């Protein structure tokens, strides 16, 4: 189980990313269409003034049940070992376990 503080930090990052999403996209479009280098630097400075945690690359997917940050399956939003346990317990419809 992940620490509660780490999970709350991820939620805070998600909120910041949603809040600044349009601002970041519009400034990136302005950078690509700016004719001179000095204008690009001004727009880039505006982009840099936004919080670091508003960048989408700072987000990290976590397991829905345990909060584990690694080995997550996007379709189920679960980590690998929790997914395996749920499949073996027949809690996920449509998922089949492999047997050799």
UniProtKB/Swiss-Prot annotation:
Alphabetical UniProt keywords: Chloroplast, Plastid, Ribonucleoprotein, Ribosomal protein, RNA-binding, rRNA-binding
Cellular component annotations (GO), alphabetically ordered: chloroplast; small ribosomal subunit
Keyword Ribonucleoprotein attached: yes
Entry annotated with the keyword Ribosomal protein: yes
Domain of life: Eukaryota
Subcellular location(s) of the protein: Plastid, Chloroplast
GO molecular function, one term: rRNA binding
Coiled coil: none
Cited InterPro entries: Ribosomal_uS14, Ribosomal_uS14_bac/plastid, Ribosomal_uS14_CS
Any single GO BP term: translation
PANTHER family: 30S RIBOSOMAL PROTEIN S14, SMALL RIBOSOMAL SUBUNIT PROTEIN US14M
The protein's assembly and partners: Part of the 30S ribosomal subunit.
Role of this protein: Binds 16S rRNA, required for the assembly of 30S particles.
Family: Belongs to the universal ribosomal protein uS14 family.
NCBIfam families: PRK08881.1
Name of protein: Small ribosomal subunit protein uS14c
Protein's organism: Oenothera argillicola
């Amino acid at each position: 189980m992940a620490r509660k503080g780490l999970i709350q930090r991820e939620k805070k990052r998600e909120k910041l990313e949603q809040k600044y999403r349009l601002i970041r996209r519009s400034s990136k479009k302005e950078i690509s269409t700016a004719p001179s280098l000095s204008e690009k630097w001004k727009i880039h400075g505006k982009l840099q003034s936004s919080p670091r945690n508003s960048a989408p690359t700072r987000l990290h997917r976590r397991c829905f049940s345990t909060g584990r940050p690694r080995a997550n399956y996007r379709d189920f939003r679960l980590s690998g070992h929790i997914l395996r346990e749920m499949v073996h317990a027949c809690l996920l419809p449509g998922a089949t376990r492999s047997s050799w």
